[in-house]
From Swiss-Prot:
Pfam families listed in its UniProt record: AA_kinase
Higher taxonomy: Bacteria, Pseudomonadati, Myxococcota, Myxococcia, Myxococcales
Protein name according to UniProt: Acetylglutamate kinase
Function recorded in the entry: Catalyzes the ATP-dependent phosphorylation of N-acetyl-L-glutamate.
Keywords of this entry: Amino-acid biosynthesis, Arginine biosynthesis, ATP-binding, Cytoplasm, Kinase, Nucleotide-binding, Transferase
Name of the gene encoding the protein in the UniProt record: argB
NCBIfam families hit by this protein: argB (TIGR00761)
Gene Ontology CC, one term: cytoplasm
Superkingdom per UniProt: Bacteria
Length: 272
């Protein structure tokens, strides 16, 4: 039995790839594997803000969240996307349970204090109603796993006073993987894994250790935005997860293979 945390971007919720994910999830859950899903909704939130005439303000790649933006996030992430995602999973034989921070305090958070952020100047930045994860309701998730339900967590946390807080979906997924001591955190992306040649999908690197990552950066194989993404993934391993899988451009069976046969699909990152 394995414990898997799956991170889905908002863009996949209404894509054909979701049905491939759902079918593999059913196979994994039928095999008594424990699966939790974390999803975001950034593109849909930005689109709704534009329709409503609201400014989308980004600071160092993070969304500034005022009261109006938080209302949009509630509607989009905890509302429409969570319901639509659960519906698609249900249609494929998976039994999902939609959750957010206020659902049994599933995602426990505190408001992030102002802090200096890389790329945002020397002064501390206040991101508004943005939260930092301080814990999860692990007994609740454990009960759902025992009954072969799949928790589907929208990336909204909640503090002890009941205030909803916007949290980056990758952050929620990474910290949940650590808290569960997950066998794998699977990041579904737009690429089939880490590539030696970004123009050649067949140049996928099946497995990377920390030492190999440093060598690939030094020789220029890994460059640009992939460097911080992989740095963050190796931090997840230090936080308690056993592996991180980068997976995309899915074919039938890819998710199942990536979890049960590490390296057979996507790229698996391991600590050593």
């Amino acid at each position: 039995m394995k414990t898997i945390v799956l991170k889905l971007g908002g863009e996949i919720v209404h894509s054909p790839e979701l049905d491939l994910v759902a079918r593999d999830l059913r196979t994994l859950v039928d095999g008594w594997n424990r699966v939790a899903i974390v999803h975001g909704g950034g593109p849909q939130a930005t689109a709704l803000q534009k329709r409503l005439g609201l400014e989308t303000r980004m600071v160092a790649g993070r969304r500034f969240t005022d009261e109006a933006t938080l209302e949009v996030m509630k509607y989009v992430v905890a509302g429409r996307l969570n319901v639509d995602l659960c519906g698609r999973l249900l249609a494929n034989g998976v039994m999902p349970v939609g959750l957010h921070g206020a659902s049994g305090h599933a995602i426990q958070a505190t408001r992030r204090p102002p802090r200096v952020m890389q790329g945002a100047g020397p002064e501390p930045v206040d991101l508004g109603l943005v939260g930092d994860v301080v814990g999860f309701n692990l007994p609740l998730l454990g009960d759902l796993f025992e009954r072969r339900y799949v928790p589907v967590l929208a990336c909204l946390g909640c503090d002890d006073a009941g205030q909803a807080l916007n949290i980056n979906g990758d952050t929620v997924a990474s910290q949940l993987a650590g808290a569960l001591r997950a066998d794998a955190l699977v990041l579904v992306t737009s690429t089939p894994g880490v590539l030696r040649d970004v123009k050649d999908p067949s140049s996928r690197i099946p497995r990377i250790t920390r030492a190999e990552f440093e060598r690939l950066v030094a020789d220029g194989t890994i460059s640009g935005g992939m460097i911080p993404k992989l740095e963050e993934s190796f931090e997840v391993l230090r936080g308690g997860a056993r592996s991180v899988v980068i997976l995309g451009k899915l074919a039938p069976g890819d998710l199942e293979a990536a979890v049960l046969e590490p390296g057979s699909a996507g790229t698996v990152l391991v600590g050593e």
